[in-house]
Amino acid sequence: MADKITTASAAWLTDPTVFAVNRTPAHSNHVTFSHIPEIGEPSDLKQSLDGEWRVEMVQASDIDLEEEPFAAEDFDDSAFGRIDVPSHLQNAGYMNHKYVNIQYPWDGHENPQEPNVPETNHVALYRRTFTVAERLDAARQNGGTVSITFHGMATAIYVWVNGMFVGYGEDGYTPNEFDITEALHDGENVVAVACYEYASASWLEDQDYWRLHGLFRSVELAAQPHVHIEDMKVEADWNPETATGSLDALLAVRNAKNAATVSATLKDLSGNVMWETALAASDETGIVSGSLDVKPWSAESPALYELQVVVIGHDGAIVETATQRVGFRRFRIEDGIMKLNGKRVVFKGADRHEFDAKRGRAITRQDMIDDITFCKRHNINAIRTSHYPNQEYWYDLCDEYGIYLIDETNLETHGSWCLPGDVVTEDSAVPGSKPQWEDACVDRVNSMMKRDYNHASVVIWSLGNESYAGDVFRAMSVHVHELDPNRPVHYEGVTHNRKYDDVTDIESRMYAHADEIEEYLKSDPKKPYISCEYMHAMGNSVGNMDEYVALERYPQYQGGFIWDFIDQAILVRLPDGDERLCYGGDFGDRPSDYEFAGDGIVFADRTPSPKAQDVKQLYANVRIVPGETGVEIANDNLFVSTADYVFVTRVLADGEPVWQAEQRFDVPAGETKHFDIEWPLEAYRGQANELTLEVSQRLAAAEEWASKGYELSFGQTVVAGSKPVAASETKPVDGIVTVGRWNAGVQGSGREILLSRTQGGIVSYTLDGREFVLRRPTLTTFRALTDNDRGAGHGYDRAQWVGAGRYAKCVNNTIEQVNDDTLKAVYEYELATPQRTHVTITYVADTTGKLHLSVDYPGETQEAPTIPAFGLEWTLPVEYSNLRFYGPGPDETYADRKHAKLGIWNTNAYDDHAPYLMPQETGNHEDVRWAEITDDAGHGMRVSRHGESAFALSLQPYSAFMLEEAQHQDELPAPKHMFLRVLAAQMGVGGDDSWMSPVHPQYHIPADKPLHLDVDIELI
């Protein structure tokens, strides 16, 4: 080992060739003990330094690293502030939050010139005291060593112990470990850390994320006995032809000459011994098992075992035990297809940043458990660790729960090579082909691989994200293949320079449209395909996802990763006591990309967004198609049959469950079968307008991530009943129809309807004195722009529709008494558009108190942009906030996002308002048959389809224009009314991306086609 450097240097901060000083070589994250542990026991050779530290913020220009007094053991830090570790300086109030996507955060304040760092460079001076725990100190006293490890920091650290400089480190997403044995003394010790905001490493860490700093993962001490297993490289292979496993491990043993033997034992997690051996200790100790009778690992059935290696001294005593959990599996590319244990795999994935609204990247174990629970519950089988190695515990969870991982190097340099308008500047790309960056980049991927190599869940190594291409990536790829000849290499950046196609084993693209992907798949490609990012889930998004899922019919299409998992918004308490989820720019940070980090399928508080409803159904491994003779079940799982699931079969009569049974259907993995079901259709056909045949796949037993009976997938088919949509009722004899000079009205059954000749529609609708018309319902042709709408220029393209309905004028009306019981009013409106299209609103009221409402748009003969939405908006008193409806649900649906379950659902306007980071269109329900809008006493309004055509509906505490004006959810006013929108149609939400791609044409509303809204309304 080279002599240690004992003096810190500021020059390292701007030298790309210096990225680690005195750092311990990267190694596996196996767990060590001073004894033979029980399964799952924590290490007794580690000591946490998490907790309260002291901290002071200074500028880099104020520090002399060679003679820095704050590092001295006797330095008086009583004036320092306090901070918890792990945490971020920004979240603790010591630095300002900044969010940018592509650009470097100092761009414009200074001209970014690599490898230089900004003149304004914050430094956090951390200090804390510690006493080495007895077990660790015993190892030190007996010839062993003690190290300190920083598991996560940003961006560069200098470390001193008791005034002695012990090391410098960059790449804060893999361990920075330093040997501190010589610096320790008995009793209380002091560790001091200078944590820099910027270093040359900042050029490699331009991830689309909040720019957060500090010691954000755990800090710990670890003892290494005088004979120590430094590294374990374990190959746990599974041979699908023989259905057996094999173990091949290489151990790096320090001071092996001081040990006699190394014994290895493989156990299942119940402690049963599967295999064991013993051999003489050597510096490189190889362990080979031969064939093993073990279960294979997969996301579907994540069987794990524990390899336990014990070092025995010459005196027969245990020197050290090392444990490593392993899963036996084989992941290879064969014939251009990625296969797990011999079977083609499809990644049903998401890209996941580590994030918590209060803690930033300093997420807790419970956060990770919540995330993986969400994944399993929503049929997500793969995660890309975008764009850096994650906390080590996440990999343990993925091994245990069953998640495939693309493990991604901490590398993104988007701002170095991309100008506005996606203009590529190859010469400025970092690292590109610049030799001064090569060692740092190779070191980053090496550190990740060494740490995570033994995890069964890691199936692909990724070289980084959005960093263009170049010889440096070729060097990284070569290194990965040398270290691991089995797992494939992933890198999307070569799409910008195909000269470097050899860098990646996988054709990976971002935001390629389904038709573009299909074109590749039809070209007889040599490489398998994945979308490392697709379905940009910003705000109200994830439309037309089914077009991508349909590509699974091509063998070389192997899935994609939704961008992304969680909204990244910082929870802040405002001066008035309210809380706000803040996004870029809210902290005065400039430049900023504002709300562009709000892309999650879960909200920042980890509650599922409505988008997750479609993701769960479309990602399901079991596809179910009921029919009148039974059900067809396709099992897309690779290894597990459906025998261990329960299938609940139901018949719904107009949404109401009338029959249910529980059955078992055994479909082997990869097969499709039909099962007969004796649906009691004839018993209920005459009682309903439509019958829904439903089959639901549910857990037969509880899992770690869900309780027994949890639904994973469903299938529904609607068949016709023989009952008409609405049976006519007998007219009451005491009804009154009045045609006045200014108004006309109908009274009957305690209800009164008043239609105005001057106001352009209904002006009163009462039941027992309760008024349901605050103002005449207005035409609506607008929706609050979604993030995708804004990105695609929807506001500009369809600006004419913003006020077309709102400001339409009534140009004609006719009111007539049809008969003794019925009144008809027809209002002709001219839309406020250049085309001046005429729309007809017709009310037919009778003495039962019912109202038949129809709205007709004839289709425009002149050229006009497609229509965002078309129907009526009805303003109701605020107490009418409850919504019960029959249609797909329970969450919101749109024309291109409605893989929901048909049924009768109960919600309310507040819960139905999805709190997207930027307020926007929300709460729509497609294909509604009827809906009831009521107060808590059950009084209200029922809206039903008239005839066979369903409608779209939403009930919100805010109007579209309120949503359009607000920048944050807390800016929306306290609700004073409810806004009921009854629509003939609303356009889809899109999802290909949020900056360029419009909603697909089939989900638009053409202006030249007629639209017809036809509903019955009654008060209840």
Kindly give the residue locations of the regions a language model identified.
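Accessory beta-strand-rich segments of carbohydrate-active enzymes
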Residues: 3-24, 29-31, 39-40, 54-58, ...
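Extended acidic/polar, glycine-enriched regions
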Residues: 185-188, 250-334, 687, 691-732
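Catalytic cores of secreted or luminal carbohydrate-active enzymes
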Residues: 205-229, 577-626, 632, 636-656, ...
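An acidic-aromatic loop/edge-strand motif
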Residues: 96, 101, 105, 110-116, ...
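Beta-strand/loop-rich accessory regions of lumenal/periplasmic or secreted enzymes
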Residues: 91, 197, 298, 679-688, ...
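Accessory carbohydrate-binding/adhesion or oligomerization-edge regions at the termini
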Residues: 2-105, 194, 549, 562-570, ...
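Extended substrate-binding grooves/exosites of carbohydrate-active enzymes
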Residues: 2-41, 164, 203, 318-632, ...
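Beta-strand-rich binding/interaction modules
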Residues: 159-161, 244-280, 631-663, 675-676, ...
